[in-house]
UniProtKB/Swiss-Prot annotation:
Gene Ontology terms describing biological process: 'de novo' pyrimidine nucleobase biosynthetic process; 'de novo' UMP biosynthetic process
InterPro entries in the cross-refs: Amidohydro-rel, DHOdimr, Dihydroorotase_CS, Metal_Hydrolase
Protein name: Dihydroorotase
Species name: Enterobacter sp. (strain 638)
GO cellular component terms attached to this protein's record: cytosol
Length: 348
């Protein structure tokens, strides 16, 4: 029997999907990411959303101002697609190195998405320009029609939006973000080299029973919502297989405690402090630690055509307790796995 590794030395990872918010929240959460990750794809769903080059430059500077001086971190900015967006603005931002990608939110699919896209036809000129540029499209893959059950919205999106879009623009590079279903896992697996996926720690670790059985656990509530266990297992099997077009994207999405623990609570898990240990645990449980570094540190840069990070970090097989809460100016943040014991710890 092969001895279990006690230390994992991996190339510094990147987070290919994160929400850093703004203001005091931004200042609180950025260091949890900048300490461990070389880069992060920053979501543009602020209020108002990031739709111009100037707005992205200003937001990038606010992020950099929140990075501790001893951290080496590069935020990668994204453009929020709207029905009225000018293709020239997107091209300008991409060519100037301001926009790394553009984000498609179906209108009202998630937090601060009311400005999102009402139909693919409305943004076709932008998407055609992105295809020519080789600029990645990042997709929140859920339909938002009221008659579609929330647990079916991802699968329906594949049929009615994603596949027709990819047939229409066959050279467009697409990241199917935070996939949550067996349907999506199989769709990405069977796709070509222009289609990739990010997967969150919560969707690998948990299913809807964990969120709903024995009481509602609001800090596991995120969008896309946790699905049944067969979908969780499909995601775990995909990453454990060493599939090279799936990579780390935490979708860390902080909300103040009073906005999570409410009669109408917000969607999102603040997992930045615990995500790396969570991913390592999943790969360990699946007997697939040999694929962990590629998922965390290699697959993403290769898909985006970016260089690998040149520094390394180490995780050790060591138990530690996740802090119960994190102070904000006038509230608290509850991290993913608050108060629980994790079995991998980043060596500092």
């Amino acid at each position: 029997m092969t001895a279990q590794p006690q230390v994992l030395k991996i190339r510094r990872p990147d987070d290919w999907h994160i929400h850093l918010r703004d203001g005091d929240m931004l200042k609180t959460v950025v260091p949890y990411t900048s300490e461990l990750y070389g880069r992060a794809i920053v979501m543009p769903n602020l209020a108002p959303p990031v739709t111009t080059v100037d707005a992205a430059i200003a937001y990038r500077q606010r992020i950099l101002d929140a990075v501790p001086t001893d951290h080496d971190f590069t935020p990668l900015m994204t453009c929020y697609l709207t029905d009225s967006l000018d293709p020239n603005e997107v091209e300008c931002g991409f060519n100037e190195g301001v926009f790394t990608a553009a984000k498609l939110y179906p209108a009202n699919a998630t937090t601060n998405s009311s400005h999102g896209v009402t139909s693919i036809d409305a943004i076709m000129p932008v998407l055609e320009r992105m295809e020519k540029l080789g600029m990645p499209l990042l997709v929140h893959g859920e339909v938002t029609h009221a008659e579609i059950d929330i647990f079916d919205r991802e699968a329906r999106f594949i049929e009615t939006v994603m596949e027709p879009l990819r047939q229409r623009l066959q050279g467009l590079k697409v990241v199917f973000e935070h996939i949550t279903t067996k349907d999506a896992a199989e769709y990405v697996r069977d796709g070509n080299e222009l289609l990739a996926a990010t997967i969150t720690p919560q969707h690998l670790m948990f299913n809807r029973n964990h969120m709903l059985v024995g009481g509602v656990r609001p800090h596991l509530y995120c969008l896309p919502i946790l699905k049944r266990n067969i979908h969780q297992q499909a995601l775990r099997e995909l990453v454990a297989s060493g599939f090279t077009r799936a990579f780390l994207g935490t979708d860390s999405a902080p909300h103040a405690r009073h906005r999570k623990e409410a009669s109408c609570g917000c969607a999102g898990c603040f997992n930045a402090p615990t995500a790396l240990a969570s991913y390592a645990t999943v790969f360990d449980e699946m007997g697939a630690l040999e694929h962990f570094e590629a998922f965390a540190s290699i697959n993403g840069p290769r898909f985006y055509g970016l260089p690998l990070n040149e520094t390394f970090i180490e995780l050790e097989r060591k138990e530690s307790q996740v802090e119960e809460s994190i102070a904000l100016t006038d509230d608290t943040l509850i991290p993913f796995l608050a108060g629980e014991i994790v079995h991998w710890t980043v060596k500092r």
